[in-house]
C-alpha cells in the first residue's frame, strides 16, 4: 500500500532499510545502489567495521517491507542479521524481549543509527542499482 500510495515520490527516498529478521547480531552491510552510492556504503561500512559488520557487495536483497519500493526504483541497504535462532522464538510463547541478547540489540541499534545518519548526511544523492539488461 505504501509503495502504491507514494509511487510518484520514490525518488525522494534517500535509502530504504528495514530490520525484520529477529534479534541476532548484524554481520554484513549489503545494498542495491549504483556505483557512486556504493562508495558511500563502503564509507559507512568502515564506520560499522568495529561492530563486526563487513561490506558485502554480492549478496542480499531488500526485505519484504521495502521490496515494493525497491522494485519501483528506491535505493536500499540491508544490515544482514544472524537468524540462526529466528524460528526458535518468532511467533512463539518465547518471543519476548527477555530472550534478546542485550549486546546484540546494542549492536543493531548502533548499526542502524550509523546507517541512517550517514546516509542522510552524505552529499551523494543515492541511486538504485541499474537494472540488468535482457
PLM features: what roles do these ranges have?
Residues 14-19, 58, 68, 75-80, ...:
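Structural recognition of the beta-strand scaffold that forms the well-ordered cores
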Residues 2, 37-47, 62-65, 105-111, ...:
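Stable alpha-helical elements in mature extracytoplasmic
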Amino acid at each position: 500500500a505504501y509503495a502504491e500510495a507514494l509511487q510518484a515520490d520514490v525518488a525522494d527516498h534517500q535509502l530504504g532499510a528495514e530490520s525484520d529478521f529477529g534479534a541476532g547480531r548484524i554481520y554484513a552491510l549489503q545494498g542495491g545502489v549504483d556505483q557512486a552510492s556504493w562508495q558511500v556504503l563502503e564509507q559507512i561500512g568502515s564506520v560499522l567495521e568495529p561492530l563486526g559488520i563487513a561490506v558485502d557487495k554480492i549478496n542480499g536483497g531488500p526485505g519484504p517491507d521495502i521490496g515494493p519500493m525497491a522494485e519501483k526504483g528506491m535505493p536500499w541497504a540491508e544490515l544482514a542479521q544472524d537468524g540462526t535462532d529466528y524460528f526458535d522464538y518468532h511467533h512463539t510463547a518465547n518471543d519476548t524481549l527477555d530472550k534478546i541478547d542485550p549486546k546484540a540489540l546494542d549492536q543493531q541499534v548502533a548499526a542502524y543509527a550509523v546507517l541512517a545518519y550517514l546516509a542522510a548526511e552524505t552529499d551523494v544523492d543515492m541511486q538504485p542499482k541499474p537494472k540488468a539488461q535482457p
